[in-house]
Amino acid sequence: MKNIQIFFLLLSFSVFSQSTFEKAEKLYAQKKYNEAEKLFSEHLKSQPNNAKTIEYLGDIAGHQKDWNTAITNYKKLKVSYPKNANYWYKYGGALGMKAKESNKFKALGMIDEVEESFLTAAKLDVKHVES
């Protein structure tokens, strides 16, 4: 009997987690980034390695021009999935935007990493739309 209760408890957590993610996706599609960010962050607590959730949080940070947060999220993804061209591309894009908004000396120090990220994305997927 106790095993059945534990099973249903775990199942309810799973259902709650999925519905949180789905709600967050809908909010993101409606460009309600602040609300979506809260739900994605909540979802990430229960599934800390969920790549799609991390990517959405990076995308939201990019929309909010929070380049440091976007970089942190995309860096996690490119390290965890080094053969995914899109993660390298997004990481390079966030770095490039941070460099653009930084002073010239700081930007100069970032250019090599931006270039490396874009070149890696292009090597991984020659048909990548934006590389």
Put a short name on every predicted segment.
Residues 20, 51-52, 85-86, 129-130:
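Helix-start (N-cap) detector for alpha-helical repeat units in TPR-like alpha-solenoids
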Residues 15-56:
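N-terminal leader/linker segments that initiate helical-solenoid repeat arrays
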Residues 29-30, 63-64, 97-104:
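Register position in tetratricopeptide repeats
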Residues 56-59, 90:
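Canonical tetratricopeptide repeat
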Residues 48, 82-83, 126:
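Short coil turns that delineate tetratricopeptide repeat
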